[in-house]
Amino acid sequence: MLIGVLVVALLLAVPVPAHSAESPAPVHANHQLGTPVSGPGQGRTDPDQARPLQWLLHAQGQDGGWGPEANTKPDVATTSLSGIALLRLGHTPSSGEHRESARKALMFVIRAVERSPAPEEFIEPEGTLPQRKLGRGIDTFLAAQFLGEAVKLMPAGEDRRRASAALELCVSKIQSAQRKDGSFSKDGWAPVLSSAFAANGLYAAKDVGARVSPSSLAKAEDYMMKGYDSESKTFRTADSAGVALYQAAGALGMAARAGTMKEAPAVAAREHLADEAFVRGFGSYGGEEHVSYMLSTEAFAKAGGDDWTKWSKSIRMRLAAIQREDGTWRGDHCITSTSFCTAASLITLAIRPANTPQQM
């Protein structure tokens, strides 16, 4: 009897390891390479897009912004990513079933930019979840991409004028933030993704005639391509929290934008992204994984061909497997925000090669 009591006491005294927000969730022992870990969407091969879109629309605040969850304080980065999702699904500030939601998101971002007119000034107060993980400038970087994509789809008028002016200011802020090595951020948990979004913002701005410095884009490309070490044939991870997926996604996205998909970093990225362990990134699905899939899917779509077909099928199966019962996606580590992860996944699912229609 005494021995039994002592055994129970010892068992209770043994600490149980906890999985923090920074540590990956355990992988099931029967997990096979090439197949995502099963989840609520087990058995599905294509994600539901209608329910996550409805959730995202419902989660939008009265002021037009999105926070990490429904009915939470909004931030510019999450709002911009959610706005891009609406645009990609055909809901612009002036057309589409959910045009009013898109316009409210646009005006939320425009007002935030207008409140911070100095070129070096951040447009969002410090302390948001995207900032902590991707760096202080992520709001500006994503705002530029959202504004650039929105302006392209808007008719002439006051809204477009304000959006264009806000975009020009974001471009100034982004170029002021660029460092000597071509990066745009060294703070946050995985700043390489922030630099990838900064470059995306500049390209989106350039596409609609904003004043973007060619040297700034050249430096950004050089920085991202140097993230691949051709001698060791690996991706450097100093700016990607030790996760090669983030660096590879950034490099591949940049190569697609710059037209250098045949160069070594892009070729290596495509090869690595065919490996299940590599695609798992940190080991569980945080917002960083979701945006890495988004960046990679953009690049594969630009290239087209068999690589696109294989990647598209695999990423859609993966997102179907980890989709939650209510249709949303949520991060397992770091960027855990339902709004952020759901928006990123909707963008991924909306991406198609040129001249291929979007399907819902």
Label every model-predicted segment.
Residues I3-P15:
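Bacterial N-terminal signal peptides
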Residues A18-M360:
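Preference for long, amphipathic alpha-helical scaffolds in soluble/luminal domains
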